[in-house]
Amino acid sequence: MKEKFLNLLKKPITNSYLSNISKKTIKKEFFYNLSVVFDKKNYLVSLANPISPKKQYTSKYAHRASQSITMNQSFKKIALKLQKKFKPSFSLEIGSNDGVFIKNFSKKKIIAVEPCSNLARITNKLGYVTYDKFWNKEL
């Protein structure tokens, strides 16, 4: 049983910036109902109406997490704690963005999955194996 607990109404999709703002383009812009549900059976929080990955994760995804000093510091701190506590021989990061987290790991000990090809190219150029795919059971 899923219970809606937060309704943020209709929102434009992330990173879908309009290059030419007019009444016509605004009418064509994709909006979706952004509401959050709690699954009482599994104790999971998720979007009530997930957006198609193909629509959301494009080759022009603009947000780059490493441009934030706070994100860099936070991910470095988390990576160091995880490495100290678990001493992983290998790691997988799903949704690596531009490599803000994985850059704190040895290139031989981590693989990334990033559905936005422009971001996956960045981490590949840094020398990390990054799959330019959406994480699903086929991958």
Q: Which ranges hold each PLM region?
A:
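N-terminal juxtadomain amphipathic helix
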Residues: 1-69
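Conserved alpha-helix/loop element of class I SAM-dependent methyltransferases that forms part
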Residues: 70-88
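Conserved class I S-adenosyl-L-methionine
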Residues: 87-97
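Conserved SAM-binding loop of SAM-dependent methyltransferases across substrates and taxa
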Residues: 98-108
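Conserved SAM-binding motif I beta-strand of class I
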Residues: 109-114
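Conserved SAM/SAH-binding beta-strand->alpha-helix loop
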Residues: 116-118
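Conserved SAM-binding strand-loop segment of SAM-dependent methyltransferases
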Residues: 126-139
